[in-house]
Amino acid sequence: MHSPENGPAHVVDALVIGAGQAGLATSYWLTRHGVEHQLLEQRPELGGAWQDRWDSFYLNTPNFGFLLPDLTYNGPEPDAFLPRDEVIGLFRDYAARIKAPVRLGTEVTRMVAVDGGFTVDTSQGRWQARNVVLANGAFQVPRVPPAAVELPGRILQLHSHDYRNPQQLPGGAVLVVGTGQSGGQITEDLLDAGRTVHLSVSTCPEAPRRYRGQDVFHWILQLNLRGPEYGLNGLQADQLPSPAARFMCNPLISGNGGGHGIHVRDLGRRGVRLHGRFEGTDDGDLVFSDDLPARLALVEAGFSQRLGRMADAYIAAAGIDAPPADPAPVDPWLPADSGERLNLDAAGITSVIWCTGYGLDFGFLDIPVLDAWNYPRHSRGVTEVPGLYAVGLPWLTKHLSATLSVVGDDAEFVASHIAGR
């Protein structure tokens, strides 16, 4: 082993930090361009962030959405969804097939720009490279609200990152905070196990699993890839209203059980106690915002006001013969008590699962290239620092840039740029 401080450095033309789907796609294209490179992966095994999903997890992307270079789905079930362990196995097989040069168990600790290149210190030695690709992904630092520290120590707190199944929780009721895809799906997992669940509702939009004759992801994917051909640029990164929008919620859908949309009011009908936004604690009570009816209405209207309209515009512009949209259901159901205050002991809550998203982690990067959101300043993945690139971040170039459907396109552009230096 080489010491980062004292040992001789490994030298390579291009270093790729991360060997998840972004890193592997980049490796594929670098190989095609004949660029010598090395991938560094801090995990002990391949499989990326999919290894952090719960046991019952299924991809939200249908099989037809596998569009990595030299990895597309050609089987009999294009509209089906793969479970977690099959996804992990698929990426391990892919890495072997493309002969990706990966060093596992290698954590990057510091990176600096030196003499027109970069010095990268890791847990397994020092590297020098003329080019570096940041491909360590968007699921790095679990975010938990500051008010989490107010909860008593007897309450088990887990982020969705660490949740695996209901059996790892103590007996008693569970509070799930957040209704993005993780929050909705974990709530269903707990319900199926017969657990009592309280749910703090966020503003992530619901969506139908199928829309106008296709899986809803079909239209989202077409808008990403072909929308600009018809002047429909709403899912292109340069059309975002603000930098914060790069971290907006994805539609509330699931690939479990053959795929379905998750309707928050339906969860309430099934016995989930719905609450507004979690705001903190007060004298042994959990405190929530008192706007649950407005939140539910906002959640339900989100798809039709944005993605649904975009899909309709694409269908019309492309001249696609698609069935009309089903009328949006009007659902007036509300819980008898929205529960702005909830006593932990009276409710029997013994655990909290924070489904509150992730932050980016570039703490190793000792180069002034990050914006106020810890996001690299770039154009199409090419940062303002010569030789430094990014692939696999949300909204890098498009809405789906961080997904296995589009990350290969961004990786191809970046690899071509590296080859041309």
Predicted regions: what they are:
Residues 74-78:
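A short acidic, helix-capping loop that chelates divalent metal ions and anchors anionic groups
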